[in-house]
Amino acid sequence: IRGDLNEEISKEKLRIWEYRLDPGLFSGYNPFCAVNILHDRLFIEYEKTDMTTYLNRRGMVFCDGKPLKQVALYHEGSYWVEANGQTVHFRLPKDADPAEHKIEITCREQCFAPEIPFLSYIRVKGLTCAHAATGAPVPQRGALSCYRGHHWIIEDCTIDWSNAVGIDVGNECWHHEFIPGQIIGHSVVRGCTIKDA
């Protein structure tokens, strides 16, 4: 087994943990199965772009409230996902035992969003959204979402550790068909804190 800079790591020191994801944790959406970018994007200059971020899985793993870094291999303080999205392997900082820490995974794409689009004149105040498995770049579904609605007021909310998009207040995606007369946007976001995203 090799570590950074070709430094030998003894198998006795290296502690890698495996967690098989229970499908019951997910309601129609397993973020560990979905990559950040879902389709070919014309705006990406592939020969000049490191595609790692785009091809990482949307699911995240947290240890004591802090995210582990998603990597392809076994680096300390990191995790990686098997190709089928059903098993997560992780290595904690200092090769710690997970029984001594609080381990969390993301289970949902969004924390707060309406079931139907175009709702209007809604006020959301003081809500905290954490650990959303949102994707990027489109569709832009935030941890807190207006889902194409209009005239929302979102204030004094906190978004913590969203994978990609914290708050969305627009059309979500430029591919949506424009409906004549339909109002989207015109929302106010104030006093909110988006951190560690």
Q: Where are the predicted features?
A:
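Extracellular polysaccharide-degrading/modifying enzymes targeting complex plant/algal/animal polysaccharides
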Residues: I1-R148, W152-I153, T158-D160, G166-D168, ...
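Short, intrinsically disordered, charge-balanced linker/junction segments flanking boundaries
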Residues: V189-A197
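Short coil/loop residues immediately preceding or within conserved phosphate-binding loops
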Residues: R141, I184, V189
